[in-house]
Each structure stands twice: as C-alpha cells, then as structure tokens.
Amino acid sequence: MEPNFQALRKEFPVLARKTYLNSGSYGALANDVKAAFEAYMEGRLLMGANWDAWIAKNESVRALTAALLHAVPDEIAVTASVSAGLNALASAVDFSGPRNKVIVSDFEFPTNAQIWHAQEPRGARVVHVRCAPDGYIPLENFAAAIDEQTQLVAITHVCYRNGAKLDVPGIVRLAHARGAKILLDCYQSVGSLDIDVKALDLDFAAGGMLKYLLGTAGIGFLYVRESLIQSLVPTNTGWFAQAEIAAMDITGNRPASNARRFEAGTPAVANSYAAEAGLKFVLAVGTPAIEQRNYALTRRCMQRLEEIEWPSITPTQNGRRGMTVAVPSRDSGGLSAQLLKRDIVTSHRGDNVRASFHFYNDEDDVESFVAAMRDLRGSFGPR
C-alpha cells in the first residue's frame, strides 16, 4: 500500500509556513525527531550521564543504517561526518606500491576530492574524470581513466551542484574488472533513493543523517564490505575504535574486528537520538515508495520549468538524476534570496539554484516554485 504522503506532511511543521525545497542541504525537522532531541535533554536533566542508554542508542543507529543499506551492522561505522569516515578509511590505504591511483570525478563534493589529494604526500595519485560537453560524465570517460594502477574509484552518487546521478553499476563493473575498489559518497541520495550496497557490489559507502535521512549534522556512517575490514587498519583512530573500549589500554592499538575500527572518539550522543528517529521514519515510509514519489515530483517540476522557458540543467532520465532540480541563473544567490522572501526555501551552488524534493513535498510545492520562478525570470534568468 502506498504511504499517505499528504498525511505525512503534517509531521513536518515547517511545511505549514514554507515551501521547503532544501532537503539536499538540510532535511525538514519531523515531530518525531524534535521529540527525540527533547527526550535526550530530559534524560540529561533528570539523570545526568546515562552511558548504557547512550551506547544502546548509537548501536541502534548502526543497526538501522545497516537495514537501510541492506548491509549488516558489523559493516557500519557510525562516524561524526562523512569527512571523518573518509579520513579514517584513507589512513588505512597503502599508496606505496604501483597501484596508487585514486579516481574522482568533476561531480564530487569538495570533501571527497580534498581528502584523497591530502594523501598525495603518502604516494597517492589523484585523477579527475571530466564532464562531457553536455554536462554529464559518461561511462566511457571512467573507462579511459581506470586502469591496473587504480587503487580506488571514489565517486559521488548524485552531484550536489546539478542533481546528476552517475552510472554506479557501470562504474563498479569497470573498477572491479581492473582490480580497483569502489567508494560511493551517497550523501545526496541516501534516504531519497533505494540503495542496496550488496546489489550495487560496493566496497565502501559514506553518507550522513542531516539531509534525506531527516536527522541532524554531526553524525554519519561509513559502510565497509565485511571481507575487506581485516585488511584495513586505520591510523586515524581513537578509543571507540578499539576492540575493547572499556579496557582503557594505552599499550597499543588493537582495533575492533568490525567496521567500528573506523570510528574514533566518544559518540555524538544527542545526534544519535535524532538520527535514530529520522532513520525509523524513513524506514517506516520505505525507500522504494520514497524514490517513486520523489521522481514523480522532480519530473513534474522539470516539465513545468520547460513550460516557462527556464529549463533545469539536471538530466531528465530517472537513471541519470537524483532528487535535486538545478536551475541556472545569472545571480543564483540573489534568486535564492528572492525565493526565500516568498517563503520558498532553496539553496544555491555555483550558478544554479537547487530545488531538492523529498516525500513530504507535493504538487502544490512544485506550482509555488514554478510560479515564483516565472515572476523572477526577467531579473534572474540564465546568462
């Protein structure tokens, strides 16, 4: 049975006041997530420290993330951010041999390129796969870059600037055929698309809770394929990455046998309350239904933008796009500000305004956005 999306809108108070199209930056706050924050604060006020409950909450986040990704909990590290998870992973990779290339693309969020460039003093060679003239990155561009010297292909699932979605299955096949590992940054897709790390045959995946997973900043995840964990020993570590946390052993580094070895210090307790509530909400609705809903909304938005002669630069095919509709503007910051004056919340990256849709949006949100864009086209249209 399809979820009652109109009823679910009532769980997000901001929707009564705003046309909220900014989930690709920060998801709308659900009543359940607000209540989870309040439960944490109430516990702090009445009990002070409650470590047993807090660790259990962190483990719940691990288990729920595994369920979302079709993984197992031992393959999930609960991290402070994508940056923290990738830094831990990078510290475990050996670049001293001939297989020292890292492939990234023009679609990457800065973190996913910067961290690998930071490994260059350790021997890494970072190669960028460029866009084609049409603004997309076809599979053949990756085929030309990935070779037998490639250690890792580190790619985004959905580009944060233009909403384009890479051909992940095709890139995975290319990488594995040449003996390379694959890392997927799915921050711009997880929670809005149905992601199965096993079906995609991923080696690593990273994401966070503040966008389509409805949680908050300061908490994320790193998925590591179970068969790879023992071969990777991060030097970027901490006491919560140890096999026996409570041993307080200062005589050596003895990492956990599972993906917890990619964690570091004390978990972000308050954030785990929010993340758990957000994950439960998304799982209850179901990512297959969410994906179908989001594609319908973004398709309608792109069609309506065509009608007002201000087309999006986001690819039109479902297989090539995520849930962000990117619209070019000669003053994207000014356009986003003018939309906000009309109670339409968007974001801007580069020359584009981003309208990021989630299951709690509806057709009226599309029409409000397009009507405002029609009015503002003369002042803020494309160059």
Feature names for model-found ranges:
Residues 1-383:
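Pyridoxal 5′-phosphate
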